[in-house]
Amino acid sequence: MITEREIYLTNPEEKRKVIEFLETFQLTFTGNIDYTMGLYDDDELIGTGSLGGRVMRDIAIKLSYQGRGLTRRIIRNLQIESYRRGVT
């Protein structure tokens, strides 16, 4: 089952995992991030997205999971978190 959860970038191990995941897509972690979430299949990170102010950033889905509507889940999670933070 695929689950969503916040990734705490203050944890060096969690941050390293996000950076390495993004690098597999030739994406560079942008920094200046207020919130990051991950999609997990069991404990495997299969997707991620972040908020930096009003901007959604660093959105990626593992290739073998693409085409399943998971980007929509990431965007929706980021929208909800943005509204929760009062950023519209």
Segments the model singles out, each with a brief description of its role:
Residues G38, E44-A60:
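Conserved beta-strand in the GNAT
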Residues T28-F29, T48:
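Short secondary-structure boundary/capping segments
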Residues G67-I80:
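Conserved acetyl-CoA-binding loop-helix of GNAT-fold acetyltransferases
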Residues S82-T88:
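Conserved GNAT acetyl-CoA-binding A-motif
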Residues G31-I33:
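Short, small/polar residue-rich loop motifs at catalytic or cofactor-binding pockets
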Residues E4, G38, G47-G49, Q79-S82:
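Small side chains
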Residues M1-T28:
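Short amphipathic alpha-helix that is part of the acyltransferase structural core
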Residues L63-S64:
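Extended, structured, electrostatic nucleic-acid-contact surfaces
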